[in-house]
Amino acid sequence: MTFDSQAYAAQLEDKVTRLRDLLAPFDAPEPTVFDSPLQNFRLRAEFRLWREGGERHYAMFSQDDKRTPILIEEFPIASLRINQLMPQLKAAWQASAALSHKLFQVEFLTTLAGDAMITLCYHRPLDEHWHAAATKLATDLGVSIIGRSKGKREVLGLDYVVEKLDVGGRTFSYRQPEGAFTQPNGTVNQKMLNWAYEALGDRSDDLLELYCGNGNFTLPLATRVRKVLATEISKTSVNAALSNLAENAVDNVTLVRLSAEELTEALNEVRPFRRLHGIDLKSYEFGSVFVDPPRAGMDPDTCELTRRFDNILYISCNPETLAANIAQLHDTHRITRCALFDQFPWTHHMESGVLLTRR
């Protein structure tokens, strides 16, 4: 593909128009638009391996044809580090039966801070020959390597990468574990964090955060409020978030492993939860709620939960479900800020954000 700036501008304008049209029924202000680098923006990549001509090649498949591989030699949308590592890793497995035997998938995870991890997935047990070859490879490439085989995992180095992002004049450090969700476009993620930081503003009350992940938004937003109650259901993400809070000396956040639906029940005093033992929900003075839900958006009950807060800061990876949730809240809240974040250039996907305030 060609990375033409005019083509990119036209595609981005199409996304702006789509978001504008979806939010028009709610009298939304004009969205602030945060663009992306045209290439080398994607910090993670996953490839299947395909045998052809007696060699294994990086391969991907189109959405329309899962049978015919597209052989990949370079991947311009991926970070420069991934593009540097791809030929080095390929040369290594071509030279080593211990590395290449029954290797079927490769995953790269990198950061703006320069960290990198490679996951190698196999249809066989990992033996001492693999361990020796992979240990040398990790040293040669300056990366952590994780071997996966039939539910087992071997870690050479660390099982996370470290990202550093500047938000509100402060640098935050993030552990991003292997296998956990991370924002793929680091440059746009940093813009998104700064927008959310500015939109929330300095407050003297408390924040409720649903779907906090590894603490991507939690860390900077916690510096804007008295204290935060954050929820997440993934164990891996919860552990990463706790590490990130400690690493950044953010001590006003309580993290609970509850779903949004369970938290709704807890706040409505439907039933008690052991995981809330020792946490006095009545001690919180919530003025704002921050939500970053999955593509399906908020379920109706969670949407109703957010209605009780004066400010709803909402980051969405699906503008259609965002619009549906806003429609449910529109009688009590209005959109006061709106933004489009081009996390996924050269695709129809977009990330968007709104600040809803009580009428």
Curated annotation (Swiss-Prot):
Active site: 317, 351
One GO location term (cellular component): cytosol
Short name of one Pfam family: tRNA_U5-meth_tr
Keyword entries, A-Z: Methyltransferase, S-adenosyl-L-methionine, Transferase, tRNA processing
Broadest EC class assigned to this enzyme: transferase
Positions contributing to S-adenosyl-L-methionine binding: 183, 211, 216, 232, 292
Cross-referenced SUPFAM superfamilies: S-adenosyl-L-methionine-dependent methyltransferases
Top-level taxonomic group: Bacteria
Record family assignment: Belongs to the class I-like SAM-binding methyltransferase superfamily. RNA M5U methyltransferase family. TrmA subfamily.
Protein name as it appears in the record: tRNA/tmRNA (uracil-C(5))-methyltransferase
Organism (species): Pseudomonas fluorescens (strain Pf0-1)
Gene for this chain: trmA
